[in-house]
């Protein structure tokens, strides 16, 4: 398995009563945050495992035990606004980590980042490395000169999809996008005349 998300979907098919819930809103608008909190409260379980740091705030509103998994701290604390940095630090990092029953990090580097931001939680952090999936093998393939396929994994803000779309504007190719497309992505794909295919939760 290559990611915690893939592990979750794999376990859900094998363990009775285990459900994978995808929140309805992406991004951090107040409307989206409130909708996500209500959705999470409605679908919460006895144990709630939160995979994404971008939604760590929902842990503050759940009654069951919470496990937080941190891949990295990303750009959550990067903002020119002191108020935004303050809100994100407390409601995306400090309070969620304190309320969580346990915290997992995918590397020692990430664990050190979390300990630096929230020193109090250092004793409930475990490191669980992302595993390598043995079904993945390298297969040499001749480059497709006419209409090459370009793979883009992830649609989050840090994945830079919008700039990728603009960069490919005059290049005849097919953009293969793995992840949930937002309306702004679709609009830019049309505006820049990009031929594309979109996939979600691709099994091996």
Locate the predicted segments by residue.
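Carbohydrate transferase catalytic cores enriched for Leloir-type hexosyltransferases
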Residues: 1-204
């Amino acid at each position: 398995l290559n990611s915690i998300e893939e592990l979750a979907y794999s376990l859900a098919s094998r363990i009775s009563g285990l459900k994978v819930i995808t929140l309805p809103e992406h991004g951090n608008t107040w409307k989206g945050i409130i909708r996500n909190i209500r959705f999470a409260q409605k679908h919460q379980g006895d144990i709630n495992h939160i995979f994404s740091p971008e939604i760590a705030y929902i842990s503050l509103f759940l009654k069951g035990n919470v496990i937080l998994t941190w891949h990295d701290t990303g750009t959550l604390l990067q903002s020119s606004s002191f108020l935004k940095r303050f809100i994100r630090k407390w409601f995306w990092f400090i309070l969620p980590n304190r309320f969580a029953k346990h915290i997992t990090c995918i590397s020692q580097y990430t664990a050190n980042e979390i300990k630096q931001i929230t020193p109090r939680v250092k004793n409930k952090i475990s490191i669980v490395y992302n595993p390598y999936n043995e079904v993945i093998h390298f297969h040499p393939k001749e480059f497709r000169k006419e209409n090459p396929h370009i793979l883009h994994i992830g649609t989050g803000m840090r994945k830079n999809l919008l700039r990728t779309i603009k960069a490919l504007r005059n290049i005849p190719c097919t953009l293969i996008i793995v992840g949930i497309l937002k309306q702004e992505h679709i609009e830019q794909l049309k505006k820049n005349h990009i031929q594309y295919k979109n996939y979600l939760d691709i099994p091996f």
